[in-house]
Amino acid sequence: MFHFLALTPLAHSEGFGLNTNILETNILNLAAVFALLAYVGTDFVSSLLKTRKESILKSLRDADERYQDAVNQLKQALQELETARTNAAEIRRQSEINAEAIRQRLELLTQEEMARLEEAKETIIKLEEEKAVAEVCTKVISMALVRAEKKIISSMDEAMHRRVMDMYLNLLREVY
């Protein structure tokens, strides 16, 4: 409505009325609208800009807060990772030390067992040799005694034969 109303007096002193000249009315109307907007709109636009600025600043603060939280979580995760790596390295080192100690202990036990088995083998061989020598000696002595007995029997009379037999029997009794 205001666009077509002009506050200019009419040429024929008719009073106030409708001005249909577009060039005159537009400039005046635009000036009035701009003045009204400048007076009323500054507070409104200023309020809108202030609200928008506060909203943007709040969003930036929230984003910065989330960024700081993410950075802190990353730092904590990196510290935990480093701690885990350190623990893993320590466990690996201890495992290697334990494995080496077990290997050395097993090697020592194996050497001791081999020495014990070698000693047992030597003892068994020696005992078997002694047993074989004793058996051979017993057989040789038995055969020699049988041969000597046959020789003596063939060359002796009965009295001599009894004395020799008694003597050998006494010797055998003393030995066994």
Swiss-Prot record:
Membrane topology per the entry is: Single-pass membrane protein
Instruction: Give the stretches traversing the membrane.
Output: 27-49
Describe the subunit structure. Answer: F-type ATPases have 2 components, F(1) - the catalytic core - and F(0) - the membrane proton channel. F(1) has five subunits: alpha(3), beta(3), gamma(1), delta(1), epsilon(1). F(0) has four main subunits: a(1), b(1), b'(1) and c(10-14). The alpha and beta chains form an alternating ring which encloses part of the gamma chain. F(1) is attached to F(0) by a central stalk formed by the gamma and epsilon chains, while a peripheral stalk is formed by the delta, b and b' chains.
Name where it's found. Answer: Plastid, Chloroplast thylakoid membrane
Q: Please give the superkingdom of this protein's source.
A: Eukaryota
Q: A Pfam family matched by this chain, by name?
A: ATP-synt_B
**Which controlled-vocabulary keywords does the entry list?**
ATP synthesis, ATP-binding, CF(0), Chloroplast, Hydrogen ion transport, Ion transport, Membrane, Nucleotide-binding, Plastid, Thylakoid, Transmembrane, Transmembrane helix, Transport
A molecular function GO annotation: proton-transporting ATP synthase activity, rotational mechanism
Listed name of the protein: ATP synthase subunit b, chloroplastic
Position of the signal peptide: none
Q: What is its main location?
A: plastid
Miscellaneous note of the record: In plastids the F-type ATPase is also known as CF(1)CF(0).
Q: Does the keyword Transcription regulation apply?
A: no
| Gene that this sequence comes from | atpF
**Family per record:** Belongs to the ATPase B chain family.
- What is this protein's function? F(1)F(0) ATP synthase produces ATP from ADP in the presence of a proton or sodium gradient. F-type ATPases consist of two structural domains, F(1) containing the extramembraneous catalytic core and F(0) containing the membrane proton channel, linked together by a central stalk and a peripheral stalk. During catalysis, ATP synthesis in the catalytic domain of F(1) is coupled via a rotary mechanism of the central stalk subunits to proton translocation.
Work out whether the entry's keyword set contains Cytoplasm.
no
